[in-house]
Amino acid sequence: MQDIGFELEGEYVELNQLLKLCDIVDSGGAGKALVASGAVRVDGAVELRKTCKIRAGQVVELEGVRIAVQAADG
């Protein structure tokens, strides 16, 4: 499984945008489609809300990829 660390700049990032920012998908629309397919898990549970707010400390998993979201320093 590929591990990706994502440094969160604000309070949260929308799930579909996180997938785009981590180069999992090419666009926010593709991210929405991937989430809608049921292929994405947040903290171990399937997440179907495309714009679910992902905050520091959460883990997103899909298709052999694990994204650990961390707060930005400072």
PLM features: residue spans?
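A basic, amphipathic helix-loop patch mediating RNA/tRNA/ribosome contacts
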Residues: V13-A56
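A detector for short, charged/polar N-terminal pre-domain segments
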Residues: M1-V13
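Generic structural motif recognizing short loop/turn segments at the entrances and edges of beta-strands
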Residues: Q2-I4, G38, V65
